[in-house]
From Swiss-Prot:
Species: Lycosa singoriensis
GO cellular component: extracellular region
Protein name in UniProt: U8-lycotoxin-Ls1q
Family: Belongs to the neurotoxin 19 (CSTX) family. 08 (U8-Lctx) subfamily.
Keyword set, alphabetical order: Disulfide bond, Secreted, Signal, Toxin
InterPro entries per record: Spider_toxin_CSTX_knottin
Subcellular location: Secreted
């Protein structure tokens, strides 16, 4: 009987620890999601990539996105 109670308490402690750890993890950002203010939150299969925005030769801002690793994006005219 004591063994069953002990096993139940150990199981409860393990489940509680797993739930607490999951609550503290930040959800990752999916592909093409803007991550300018959260650079480390892209999902593990994605990379953080930034692009400068220019007007009349002067930089007016910066956009960052979560993009696929190894993919090259080119501007279309």
């Amino acid at each position: 009987m004591k063994l069953m109670i002990f096993a139940g308490l150990v199981l409860f402690a393990i489940v509680s620890l797993i739930e607490a750890q999951a609550e503290h993890e930040k959800p990752c950002l999916p592909e093409y999601k803007v991550c300018t203010h959260a650079p480390g939150n892209c999902c593990s299969d994605l990379v953080y990539d930034c692009y400068g925005r220019y007007k009349s030769g002067a930089q007016i801002g910066r956009n960052c996105f979560c993009l696929q690793k190894g993919v090259i994006y080119k501007r279309e005219n």
